[in-house]
Amino acid sequence: MALYTPANPLRTRRTRADTLAETFENREQSAYLKSAVERNINMAANPERRYTLEEYLELDRTSEERLEFWNGEVFCTSGVSDEHDAIEGNIYAFLRSQIMGRGCRVFLANMRIKVPSAPPYRYADLSVLCGKAEFEKIGGVNALTNPQLIVEVLSPSTEAYDRGEKFSHYKSIPTLREYLLVAQHRPHVTRLYKQDDGTWIHTEANELTATLTLDSLGCDLPLVEIYQGVSFDAPATN
């Protein structure tokens, strides 16, 4: 599996700046936001453009899109397929049913997660923890600091990033024990689990009859629940 190369996925995602601009303009956002979106579009045309952390925090705080910051660049993580949404919803509903009453919580994709090696934070499709949720105020918003499980539903444009660079950053979260990478165009899940000695092991499940054991939560996750209602007739494009 090829490792994530920062320039390529970022440029791919920045093409959604046009959509972001239209959203702001249609809703008559403030002049500042329009200017911020224009800067985002200009960045796509000019990769040398860099944002300060303060500029990013203001843009993300007021945006309806999920924006991430890395090395002075801003890129959009929103914009998914129907299959992606269905899989995310299936996992959320099933995990919530399994851990309800145990003091655990499942967070959806709008939850900011503090990532020590890639400040200020990242967005995941799903994050889960058992016990008290802990937050840190970053740029006026709360970022979760203690997830135990993170789930990413893979898209063609983000798979290399989610498997490579993003996972390398997630590993800097002290409480993280488990990471799931879920394909959307075929039944396939990669599970990475952190052992007591700090090393990560990985397993693959690629049949609808398979079941994953989630040690971080003490429950099982059948693939048939993940892919309920999802068609594999054609590959997803997002």
Residue ranges and their predicted role:
Residues 5-10, 21:
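Ser/Thr/Pro/Gly-rich low-complexity, intrinsically disordered segments
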Residues 19, 23-238:
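Gly/Pro/Ser/Thr-rich low-complexity, intrinsically disordered segments predominantly at protein N-termini
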